[in-house]
């Protein structure tokens, strides 16, 4: 799983983005290996990020949840399964806001376990995603949000993968939220430079857009 929680975490409905409604999910071959299950969860998350139809998002969340349960039943300590389970819980939180608090707490638990298992998974994904959840979620008593803890997690991600743009974007967001505008601008600039050094791709363009937006504020 590469970048679905990557730069956006829109699957948390904390910064939900939507394009035009799309058709319901098409039938797909049942994934069987850990790698296939992780890839299937990633595909559901990517689609959910750009899906306006709440019913389709709920179907994608349910599908991702089933794949995550299968993966965890087979390899309960594997970083891919723990991380995939966390992503699936993010989809669940978006699809069912009334249960979001419980889903996000479980998500953070799985991310912590994934980070302990393999902190480098998905370009330091466990720390990066943890950072975004903590930075964007409401704080107690409404949710598990904790900006300072999120900033610490973002710094861990950057320390592991300093040239991966989403890690720098998460750091910039945390710095901005804590009032460090100078530090945030520096991180956004570093994210832009890192993205510009990559081959042209949709993810790269999204990262450049987010960095440029951050530099304008």
PLM regions and their residue ranges:
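Bacterial Sec signal peptide processing site at the extreme N-terminus
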Residues: 15-34
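Terminal, low-structured helical/coil segments at or just beyond the last alpha-helical repeat
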Residues: 22-27, 177, 185-217
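Helix-turn-helix repeat elements of alpha-solenoid scaffolds
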Residues: 54-69, 100-109, 143-151
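Short coil turns that delineate tetratricopeptide repeat
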Residues: 76, 119-121, 162
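TPR alpha-solenoid repeat register
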Residues: 81, 124-126, 167, 201
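TPR/TPR-like (Sel1-like) alpha-helical repeat modules
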Residues: 108-109, 115, 145-149, 181-198
